Amino acid sequence: MSTWANLGLQDSASPLMEQLIFFHDHALLILVMITVLVGYLMFMLFFNSYVNRFLLHGQLIEMIWTILPAIILLFIAMPSLRLLYLLDEINEPSITLKSIGHQWYWSYEYSDFNNIEFDSYMIPTNELSNDGFRLLDVDNRIVLPMNSQIRILVTAADVIHSWTVPALGVKVDGTPGRLNQTNFFINRPGLFYGQCSEICGANHSFMPIVIESVPVNYFIKWISNSVNS
């Protein structure tokens, strides 16, 4: 869930999200250092009355302010590229989940099992239980095993949607006629909430996503009950 006053990122539930948070903190530290340096130089220029009447050019300072930003950009670009490749890497999945975006709900199919598919609608506010979350709870949750490599295939039936779960560091566009995929690894049990992150019409904000992460033995029981029912 979001933190107080929407400050900061959600607690990570996957190794990829942990890496994203580390990169965010790394880049933010560099930006703070740049801001402090530029602010200090501006302050000194405003309150320094000394001038050099004979200064026509300064090759040394020009080299410094050309090379230094390039080095700083390298310190940002290298971790960013590393993380970009990590996010695109597809490992051998244990389970494949297919998600289809509609106006304005999600459909899910467990491709590795027969006849396990369902639609997931937002629960209206007047039907919520006392411990429910407004605009975030759904009637049918996605149930996935923790500590397993999961592949998700995302597409759409009408307009462009985007399947997004911040705690997992996952955001995949669902485009009609196209199949996009990514993978993630949930490292703890719990409920993880997401929403459609692409404007898709009047009820765009009413397309929540809820993942219930459970131990593998509970997931197997859930699959067995779903197949038998």
UniProtKB/Swiss-Prot annotation:
Binding, Cu cation A2: 196, 198, 200, 204
Chemical reaction(s) catalysed: 4 Fe(II)-[cytochrome c] + O2 + 8 H(+)(in) = 4 Fe(III)-[cytochrome c] + 2 H2O + 4 H(+)(out)
UniProt keywords, alphabetically: Copper, Electron transport, Magnesium, Membrane, Metal-binding, Mitochondrion, Mitochondrion inner membrane, Respiratory chain, Translocase, Transmembrane, Transmembrane helix, Transport
UniProt topological domain (Mitochondrial matrix) ranges: 49-62
Pfam families: COX2, COX2_TM
Names of required cofactors: Cu cation
Broad EC category: translocase
Function: Component of the cytochrome c oxidase, the last enzyme in the mitochondrial electron transport chain which drives oxidative phosphorylation. The respiratory chain contains 3 multisubunit complexes succinate dehydrogenase (complex II, CII), ubiquinol-cytochrome c oxidoreductase (cytochrome b-c1 complex, complex III, CIII) and cytochrome c oxidase (complex IV, CIV), that cooperate to transfer electrons derived from NADH and succinate to molecular oxygen, creating an electrochemical gradient over the inner membrane that drives transmembrane transport and the ATP synthase.
NCBIfam families tied to this protein: CoxB
The protein's name: Cytochrome c oxidase subunit 2
Organism, scientific name: Drosophila ambigua (Fruit fly)
Taxonomic lineage from the root: Eukaryota, Metazoa, Ecdysozoa, Arthropoda, Hexapoda
